[in-house]
Amino acid sequence: MAIQVNINRESWPLESEFRISRGSRKVSEVITVSISDGNLSGRGECFPYARYNETLDSVEKQIFSIIPELNEKPCREYLRKVLPPGAARNAVDCALWDLEAKKANCRMWELAGLSAPEPLTTVYTLGVDEPEKMGELAFENSNRPILKLKMTGDGFDFDRVERIHKNAPNTKLVVDANEGWTIEQYVEYAPRFKKLGVIMIEQPLPADQDSQLASIPHPITVCADESCHDTSTLKGLVGKYEMINIKLDKTGGLTEALELKEAASNLGFQIMVGCMIGTSLAMAPGLVAGQGASVVDLDGPLLLKDDREHGLEFIGSTINVPSSLLWG
């Protein structure tokens, strides 16, 4: 029996405007994919990202283009041959995992031969704002074990971190420049931030300029985000970074994410598992990939006004294992 593929666009308003170095947004625009074999269906969600030349239209077009192939070979390995890494493949890959688990009447991790996931502690992200405002938000969230701070390279980033550390002195900090710094700013900030509770700096330089990181000291762990997509990009990161950020919208799904995690660990990289801003449906596969990671950034639903039905349970910054009614 032929499978049925349904593709939907969804808009999820954010709790407040979220700003990074490249711009801001008030709504998360996602695409969901449902794949049904007539009796059971699996779901996946992705976030088309302009940084990677993705739009809602382009991602939809990619998914529509492979429906004939999915009818012939509805399997994840074949999917990797017909779609490149990216948001479209992520939604389909995760939907196939969900469908396979339902057909096997087991949880996804059992199907994959993995141990059952445990609850994870996620960072909580503060978008870019004036130093005083970010300091206020840090105080409101000072009970959280780890905060992630978006930076811009506008000359006020040290003031931001200083104010945040003052208002949340016992909280670990992760700084994310989203490619917004120069090498001079990195050299200036890194040793100073180390004294302010910062444990990691994420993607300080533009991806096409990160070779400069290989020739300077790293007083704080440096993590590749925009420079790291899938296993094919991994070897080029050696000597520049100590950690990689695995996002399923970059890897093209959980299948590649699990392989990237293993390959990166074998090369000595620490692991971070991150996300775009999406609902719990997008976070649930990330929770599987995030087992044992040094840093987990799966706070997307906490930034939304509302989450979808059967969403993940967050107790403070702790994420509990997803219900099978959600995914997997």
Question: Each PLM stretch: what is its role?
Answer:
Residues S294-D297:
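Short helix/strand-capping turn motifs
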